[in-house]
């Protein structure tokens, strides 16, 4: 809507990484466009594009990180908390191994925020990402807490974040395992109340499985008896 010329290259219309190397693709697209946004799977792909394109490359989403979502989330938290970000606390509860939890951890550390991760220890962010975030937080005054206790994670926060428990491409069999692991980390009215903050707000990058109004939501209800998964 800003008048830029945009070309969308979907996977079936591109040979990136298949018949043409990432390096060659980056060099060609960098001569044709003023910027490139990559939305895909591998973090290594977007980093290689950035290395060889010669123009700005934006990470629209990878398995590891979701920085463009963080720009929107930081703005949303700033608008709706009424406080500077450095005085804002938020929690992420659920499966914390992937892009949303990783990115929220890094975002909070960089902006000097109070960041809580509530998840089973087996589903925490990787040690090297946590170590990087803690190092940054030391410089910015950020606070980082990782806990297996969901109520401890949300105590006193301004925002509670979550994401889907099973990602695109994972088999249906993964649902039972995640439900067993994460049933105590669903965002419910009770968990919201456990924050002790009557103004606490809920955030989700979407799509969310919160009712039966989708094919997946209905299948989850019929299979597991849950009306809503990560949030009710």
UniProtKB/Swiss-Prot annotation:
SUPFAM superfamilies xrefs: Aspartate/ornithine carbamoyltransferase (SSF53671)
GO biological process: arginine biosynthetic process via ornithine; citrulline biosynthetic process; L-arginine biosynthetic process
UniProt pathway: Amino-acid biosynthesis; L-arginine biosynthesis; L-arginine from L-ornithine and carbamoyl phosphate: step 1/3
One Pfam family linked to the record: OTCace_N
Binding site for carbamoyl phosphate: 15, 39, 66-69, 204-207, 232
EC number(s) given by UniProt: 2.1.3.3
GO MF annotation, one: amino acid binding
Entry keywords, A to Z: Amino-acid biosynthesis, Arginine biosynthesis, Cytoplasm, Transferase
One annotated Gene Ontology cellular component of this protein: cytoplasm
Subcellular location: Cytoplasm
Site (Important for structural integrity): 79
Catalytic activity: carbamoyl phosphate + L-ornithine = L-citrulline + phosphate + H(+)
Enzyme class: transferase
Binding-site residues for L-ornithine, renumbered to this chain: 99, 163, 167-168
PANTHER family documented for this protein: ORNITHINE CARBAMOYLTRANSFERASE, ORNITHINE CARBAMOYLTRANSFERASE, MITOCHONDRIAL
Annotated function: Reversibly catalyzes the transfer of the carbamoyl group from carbamoyl phosphate (CP) to the N(epsilon) atom of ornithine (ORN) to produce L-citrulline.
Family the UniProt entry places it in: Belongs to the aspartate/ornithine carbamoyltransferase superfamily. OTCase family.
Record protein name field: Ornithine carbamoyltransferase
Gene it is expressed from: argF
């Amino acid at each position: 809507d800003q008048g830029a010329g945009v070309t969308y290259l979907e996977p079936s219309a591109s040979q990136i990484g298949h018949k043409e190397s990432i390096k060659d693709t980056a060099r060609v697209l960098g001569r044709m466009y003023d910027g490139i946004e990559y939305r895909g799977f591998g973090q290594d792909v977007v980093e290689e594009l950035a290395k060889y394109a010669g123009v700005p490359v934006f990470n629209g989403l990878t398995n590891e990180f979701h920085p463009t979502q963080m720009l929107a989330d930081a703005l949303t938290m700033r608008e709706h908390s009424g406080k500077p970000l450095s005085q804002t606390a938020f929690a992420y509860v659920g499966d914390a191994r992937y892009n949303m939890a990783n990115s929220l951890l890094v975002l909070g550390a960089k902006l000097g925020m109070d960041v809580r991760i509530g998840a089973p220890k087996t589903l925490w962010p990787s040690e090297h990402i946590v170590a990087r975030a803690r190092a940054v937080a030391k410089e910015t005054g950020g606070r980082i807490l990782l806990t297996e206790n969901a109520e401890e994670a949300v105590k006193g926060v301004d925002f509670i974040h979550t994401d889907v428990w099973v990602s695109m491409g994972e088999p249906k069999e993964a649902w039972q395992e995640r439900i067993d692991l994460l049933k105590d980390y669903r965002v419910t009215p009770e968990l919201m109340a456990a924050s002790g903050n009557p103004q606490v707000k809920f955030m989700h990058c979407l799509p969310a499985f919160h009712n039966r109004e989708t094919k997946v939501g209905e299948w989850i209800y019929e299979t597991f008896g849950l009306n809503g998964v990560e949030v009710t």
